[in-house]
């Protein structure tokens, strides 16, 4: 009887161990390589009087534009901004196709005004970026949000959740 109990508990331990290990998520090698390539590309960006912007459109709910970082800096340092479009309209607004450029990457020319703007849907304050001009870098840039390469993170990201780049 003792031997059967031992075999039963041993089998249960093996099953639970395999079950728990199957729940561990590893990043596919292609995505990992894309992230390494993106980090190398960022490190190679020449310094200058410009910024890199990643359009982050969350439906018609939120009124921020996207993430902006300095050249050569990782996306984890980027700031979520509201655009001041008095001098230049945002790319999607110029085309009257709001949000059509979601997840696009741009070279932005302009500056931070030093002002913060209240965005009521998120109940947050965001820095104001005064856009002077822009250049499209990519319509399909490397992923910067966990939800772009993790099914588990994508499932956990709700419509009203604001992601932060990694």
Predicted regions and their residues:
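N-terminal hydrophobic targeting signals that begin at the initiator methionine
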Residues: 1-2, 25
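Bacterial N-terminal signal peptides that target proteins for export
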Residues: 2-12
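C-terminal motif of bacterial Sec signal peptides marking the signal peptidase cleavage site
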Residues: 20-23
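OB-fold and OB-like single-stranded nucleic-acid-recognition modules
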Residues: 26-166
